[in-house]
Design a protein with these regions (language model features):
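Membrane-cytosol interface segments of multi-pass membrane proteins
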Residues: 1-185, 195-196, 207
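Hydrophobic alpha-helical segments of polytopic membrane proteins
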Residues: 166-179, 213-241
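Non-cytosolic membrane-interface motifs at loop->transmembrane helix junctions
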Residues: 39-43, 196-204, 253-260
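Small-residue packing motifs within transmembrane alpha-helices
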Residues: 18-20, 43, 49-50, 203, ...
Length: 268
């Protein structure tokens, strides 16, 4: 970023971030198309969105109770309400989708996709309550991609609260180191199959790690143009190519292989 962008970074869009997100959106489409490079794309594409969000975090949101409250209200309106509304629509239309064949309750016709059957009023209400409290996992099939909105909302709110508390202490850096370590431990445990009862919250830890990496890039004014130069891109491509032959990552399922693997893939 040039000097003008650094000076006004809080008041203007960051071109590099927009470009990076645009590229990752394209890669996301390619990855979901059954491309030969899907495993390579999955190593980093979702983590990058959380890194970008962390990079755009503004400390002013955590400077007072009023600012924290305003920030939470903003995220409720922009993330939580849309998430609940979209999922609610698909929940209420569940039986209609089964009837017209968009959803299938016949294994021979499912094509390997999750079977979904008709649900009654009670189950509809249960699923709606689960959605409201983020306890439904990715049950609502057509709204499955909204796991990202749910996860981003939780990470944003969690970080704002933690940042506010950290500002009130004298050992701020120590707190952030502990938070990072705790997230690494929890993300690793979730990846190993623990804490499945967390449902919609189990993606939080891996996502928060990527979010914190974005904050560090912003804090130390890492020049994105230099980091993602032709040479940097070459190194990242090779590292990720090697990693893709070993394993892949799925943040939506909390699968990160191991923490070192995940952090390196995210940074690359």
């Amino acid at each position: 970023m040039d000097k003008v962008q650094k000076t006004n970074i809080n008041n203007m869009r960051i071109t590099e971030i927009d470009v990076i997100k645009g590229i990752c959106i394209i890669l996301m489409v390619v990855g979901h198309s059954g491309s030969p490079i899907t495993k390579w794309i999955y190593l980093f594409h979702m983590a990058v969105f959380f890194v970008a969000s962390g990079f755009c975090w503004n400390e002013i949101h955590a400077t007072s109770i009023l600012n924290v409250g305003n920030y939470i209200k903003k995220k409720i309106c922009s993330l939580y309400i849309p998430y609940v509304m979209v999922n609610a629509v698909y929940i209420f239309l569940n039986n209609f989708f089964v009837k017209i064949g968009i959803y299938s309750n016949v294994s021979e016709l499912s094509g390997g996709i999750q079977l979904i059957d008709y649900i009654g009023v009670k189950d509809t209400m249960v699923e709606l309550i689960k959605t409201i409290f983020f306890l439904s996992g990715n049950h609502v099939q057509l709204a499955g991609a909204f796991w990202f909105i749910r996860c981003l909302f939780v990470v944003n709110i969690l970080h704002c609260i933690v940042a506010f508390i950290a500002k009130k202490t004298k050992r701020r850096n120590t707190i952030w180191v502990l938070i990072f370590i705790i997230n690494c431990i929890l993300a690793s445990l979730v990846s190993e199959g623990y804490f499945q009862f967390l449902r919609g919250f189990k993606t939080t830890f891996a996502a928060y790690i990527a979010y914190m990496i974005g904050i560090l890039l912003r804090k130390y004014e890492i020049n994105l143009k230099k980091v993602y130069s032709i040479y940097g891109f070459g190194v990242s491509f090779i590292v990720l190519l090697i990693f893709s032959s070993i394993a892949t990552i799925s943040i939506s399922e909390g699968k990160i292989v191991n923490i070192v693997f995940y952090v390196i893939a995210t940074v690359c």
